UniProtKB/Swiss-Prot annotation:
This protein's GO CC annotations: cytoplasm; nuclear speck; nucleus
GO biological process: chromatin organization; positive regulation of DNA-templated transcription
Residues the record lists as N6-acetyllysine modifications: 283
Modified residues (Phosphothreonine): 345, 360
Lineage, broadest ranks: Eukaryota, Metazoa, Chordata, Craniata, Vertebrata
Function field: Controls V(D)J recombination during T-cell development by repressing T-cell receptor (TCR) beta enhancer function. Binds to scaffold/matrix attachment region beta (S/MARbeta), an ATC-rich DNA sequence located upstream of the TCR beta enhancer. Represses cyclin D1 transcription by recruiting HDAC1 to its promoter, thereby diminishing H3K9ac, H3S10ph and H4K8ac levels. Promotes TP53 activation, which causes cell cycle arrest and inhibits tumor growth. Plays a role in the regulation of alternative splicing.
Name of the protein this chain belongs to: Protein BANP
Major location (coarse): nucleus
Assembly notes: Part of a corepressor complex containing BANP, HDAC1, SIN3A, SIN3B, RBL1 and RBL2. Forms a trimeric complex in the nucleus consisting of BANP, HDAC6 and KHDRBS1/SAM68; HDAC6 keeps KHDRBS1 in a deacetylated state which inhibits the inclusion of CD44 alternate exons. The complex is disrupted by MAPK1/MAPK3-mediated phosphorylation of BANP which results in BANP export to the cytoplasm. This facilitates acetylation of KHDRBS1 and CD44 variant exon inclusion. Interacts with TP53. Interacts with CUX1/CDP. Interacts with HDAC1.
Cross-link (Glycyl lysine isopeptide (Lys-Gly) (interchain with G-Cter in SUMO2)): 141
UniProt biased composition (Low complexity): 343-354
Gene this chain is encoded by: Banp
Coiled-coil features, chain-numbered ranges: 65-98
Record-linked SMART domains: BEN
Length: 548
């Protein structure tokens, strides 16, 4: 084996052979002769004229330059993207005035979300663009993640908000001084019914997926109120809520979410909520909640509470959750009655719901005006029942047996009771969309001054005509908000089956839209004071009358 010193000598000799004119001493070469002076280290300068090396170096240089150019191009693209995001962020935060782009994200931001046993419906992402340069139009752009993009001139104008997907666009036009309705006389609320049918023939000359809706005006609901800022024609929607109810909502709803859900109950019946959602999509074939009304709720919350977009995102999820809850309750046959209120008077009513609730007769002229729209409804077959009355002292008194007459109101209509000058009670119903009713029972007896509550079971499916109550100890409960009339008379001859009017002296109990009452004593006193012709043989429990 060669030693380390021998190896160093061999390397030194090899280097000297390569450059005989310029002897080179390696850095680690050690001179053994102490008398010989050490050689100075020389810098080796190689002048190589080999063209292959030059070509190789040139290719390396070109590769590095191309890589740098690619990095520079990516940086420029990133800078352009940042600028675009900055501009969109400025639009969202209202830093620019034309146009103002406000995102209204509803439901899951990624569309459909799936768990182990549940599949939520696809909730659209909604963007509202207020463009003052296009006749003060409000453009509500609804993104459908399940569809492909379709070319459209209007879509191309407003497609910068969420690129790469098809947008179902709803153009909401603010009515001018002489343009409170559409050309065909259709009101804003009626025009909004075509929103769920985007792409249908109602949107000609606009696009296959664009529908023009005119914001309604005060003439649509003269007795109603504004949702949103009534002084801003772009941020308000007229609704059928009467001023007293709106004042009640504003007073009792301390949070934006509570107000949104309360407004939802006032504006959409629970039956409508059960078969609808925000997107109008899903495996159950649900319909879409009126976007104009939802936009009104949004305007109202922004105006009253100054909520942020994240708050509105959460509220939209709560609205969808409320609709799913109503759907599940309907599938189980449970009550859809609203516990917080029971008055649902149509906007065309000529008198208030409080007068209707207690049977107070309206003025004769108003009654005559409402009669052409009212259809008399005959009572069903009589059935003997026992009526229990709870006195002021809390004692339960059994009224002698009488006849109970039950009339189910057809779906989509509302019951009203009026009293003529001769004291006859007329039972009729007035149409109102999206309502249905049922009579439920609780097999729980009355005990003391309270009534035990249980989940009611439906006695017959919706759509039946009459119901015969079985004799026994079944507790019959007309749920709060139920538009079903049950009249009990002590006179068996006063059947009223043929539609003949029942005398007030024969009526012991009547059911009509009842306000929530928790004090039975006050309820009985109020009923006796306002209706002296009717015996206060009733018990009010959470807005319902319990009889046996």
């Amino acid at each position: 084996m060669m030693s380390e010193q021998d190896l160093a000598d061999v390397v030194q000799i090899a280097v000297e052979d390569l450059s005989p004119d310029h002897p080179v001493v390696l850095e680690n070469h050690v001179v053994t002769d102490d008398d010989e002076p050490a050689l100075k280290r020389q810098r080796l300068e190689i002048n190589c004229q080999d063209p292959s090396i030059k070509s190789f170096l040139y290719s390396i240089n070109q590769t590095i330059c191309l890589r740098l150019d690619s990095i520079e191009a990516k940086l420029q693209a990133l800078e352009a993207t940042c600028k675009s995001l900055e501009e969109k962020l400025d639009l969202v935060t209202n830093k620019q005035h034309s146009p103002i782009q406000v995102p209204m994200v509803a439901g899951s931001p990624l569309g459909a979300t799936q768990t182990c046993n549940k599949v939520r419906c696809v909730v659209p992402q909604t963007t509202v663009i207020l463009n003052n340069d296009r006749q003060n139009a409000i453009v509500a752009k609804m993104e459908d993640p399940l569809s492909n993009r379709a070319p459209d001139s209007l879509e191309n104008i407003i497609s910068n908000a969420v690129p790469g997907r098809r947008q179902n666009t709803i153009v909401v036009k603010v009515p001018g001084q002489d343009d409170s309705h559409n050309e065909d006389g259709e009101s804003g609320s009626e025009a909004s019914d075509s929103v769920s049918n985007c792409g249908q023939p109602g949107s000609q000359n606009i696009g296959s997926n664009v529908t023009l809706i005119t914001l309604n005006s005060e003439e649509d609901y003269p007795n109603g109120t504004w949702l949103g800022d009534e002084n801003n024609p772009e941020m308000r929607v007229r609704c059928a809520i009467i001023p007293s109810d709106m004042l009640h909502i504003s007073t009792n709803c301390r949070t934006a979410e509570k107000m949104a859900l309360t407004l939802l109950d006032y504006l959409f019946h629970r039956e409508v909520q059960a078969v609808s959602n925000l997107s109008g999509q899903g495996k159950h074939g649900k319909k879409q909640l009126d976007p104009l009304t939802i936009y009104g709720i949004r305007c109202h919350l922004f105006y009253k509470f100054g909520i942020t977009e994240s708050d509105w995102y959460r509220i939209k999820q709560s609205i969808d959750s409320k609709c799913r809850t109503a759907w599940r309750r309907k599938q189980r046959g449970q009550s859809l009655a609203v516990k917080s209120f029971s008055r649902r008077t149509p906007s065309s009513s000529s008198y208030s719901a409080s007068e209707t609730m207690m049977g107070t007769p309206p003025p004769t002229s108003e009654l005559q005006q409402s009669q052409p729209q009212a259809l008399h409804y005959a009572l069903a077959n009589a059935q003997q029942v026992q009526i229990h009355q709870i006195g002021e002292d809390g004692q339960v008194q059994v009224i002698p047996q009488g006849h109970l007459h039950i009339a189910q109101v057809p779906q989509g209509e509302q019951v009203q009771i009026t009293q003529d000058s001769e004291g006859n009670l007329q039972i009729h119903h007035v149409g109102q969309d999206g309502q249905s009713w049922g009579l439920c029972q609780n097999p729980i007896p009355v005990s003391g001054d309270s009534v035990a509550q249980a989940n009611p079971s439906q006695l017959w499916p919706l759509g039946g005509d009459t119901l015969d109550l079985p004799a026994g100890n079944e507790m019959i409960q007309v749920l709060q908000g139920a538009q079903l009339i049950a009249v009990a008379s002590s006179d068996p001859a006063a059947t009223g089956v043929d539609g003949s009017p029942l005398q007030g002296s024969d009526i012991q109990v009547q059911y009509v839209q009842l306000a929530p009452v928790s004090d039975h004593t006050a309820a009985a006193q109020t009923a006796e004071a306002l209706q002296p012709t009717l015996q206060p043989d009733m018990q009010l429990e959470h807005g319902a009358i319990q009889i046996q």
